[in-house]
From Swiss-Prot:
It comes from Iguana iguana. Pancreas. Keywords: Disulfide bond, Endonuclease, Hydrolase, Lyase, Nuclease, Pyrrolidone carboxylic acid, Secreted. This is Ribonuclease pancreatic. Its EC number is 4.6.1.18. PANTHER family: ANGIOGENIN-RELATED, RIBONUCLEASE.
Length: 119
């Protein structure tokens, strides 16, 4: 995965409006074409600018191990978990909004993989 696909999968800024977090996840997973053949089990959208998230790979993050970095700051995000449906267009998600720190993988100072939401 590269920086542009990371942005498509994980960055939504400013946050797309939806009637509720579940509807938000259903909409975004479809709009970003993240379920081409099967419903993705889980996906997190971060509501911060690409430059803010990119900083986690540098001064805005703390090295964890290998190429993984933990953000120093918390980000507004929506965590989407699959609860059924069928790909590509009717996957159903349970969305949970929150403000949390994140762990990402970096290559050449750019985020390339979303590892997890830190509790």
């Amino acid at each position: 995965q590269d920086w542009s696909s990371f942005q498509n999968k994980h960055i939504d800024y400013p946050e797309t409006s939806a009637s509720n977090p579940n509807a938000y996840c259903d909409l975004m997973m479809q709009r970003r074409n993240l379920n081409p053949t099967k419903c993705k089990t889980r996906n997190t959208f971060v509501h911060a600018s690409p430059s803010e998230i990119q900083q986690v790979c540098g001064s805005g993050g703390t090295h964890y191990e290998d190429n993984l970095y933990d953000s120093n700051e918390s980000f507004d995000l929506t965590d989407c978990k699959n609860v059924g449906g069928t790909a590509p267009s009717s996957c159903k998600y349970n969305g949970t909004p929150g403000t949390k720190r994140i762990r990402i993988a970096c290559e050449n100072n750019q985020p390339v993989h979303f590892e997890l939401v830190l509790s």
